[in-house]
Amino acid sequence: WDPAVARRSMDQALTKLNNNVQGVVSSNDGNAGAAVAALAEQGMAGKVPVSGLDCTVQALQLILLDQMTQSVWRDFDMMAEATAKATVALINEDSLDGIVMGTSPANSAGKEVPMVPVGFYNAVGEAGVQYVIDNDPSITKADVCKGEAAATSFCKG
């Protein structure tokens, strides 16, 4: 979860694999951005698919710059509501039926973990960036259209 560690790991992977990397799947956009930076140093940014999670402003900018393929956006209000319902049920020692909708695969301890699924959207290209801007009150077009991204057709239009 630390972009500095992710960058170091990506640099090491590129060295060990002689730049023979076919794609990067990252658990968050900070680490995806670090992977893009490492790829850029090797002249590979935009040539290797990179995916992230969270649809941060940086990720949306990298998508517009064709350096990141996609990021997954989740509605934080929906996540907060599901968390609040589960928390209240646990505090009141009530059933989680109707809140928990299954289990995740077994974790490293061999135990399945109750799961509360939350809807998501795969933000790809300009349409994906626009979707996030339209649906996430914490991100504006003005935020995204700064720096290098300001020169993209999305930001100029």
Regions found by a protein language model. Name each.
Residues 23, 71-72, 98-100:
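Short, hydrophobic secondary-structure boundary micro-motifs
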Residues 4-20:
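Short, well-structured alpha-helical segments in soluble
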Residues 1-9, 25-31, 54-58, 74-80:
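Hinge/beta->alpha junction and helix N-cap segments in small-molecule ligand-binding domains
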Residues 82-157:
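Hinge/cleft segment of the Venus flytrap/periplasmic-binding protein
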Residues 28-36, 64, 74-95:
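Extracellular/periplasmic ligand-binding modules, especially the Venus flytrap/periplasmic-binding
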Residues 23-69:
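Venus flytrap/periplasmic-binding-protein-like
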Residues 12-16, 38-42, 62, 66, ...:
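Structured segments of extracytoplasmic/periplasmic soluble domains
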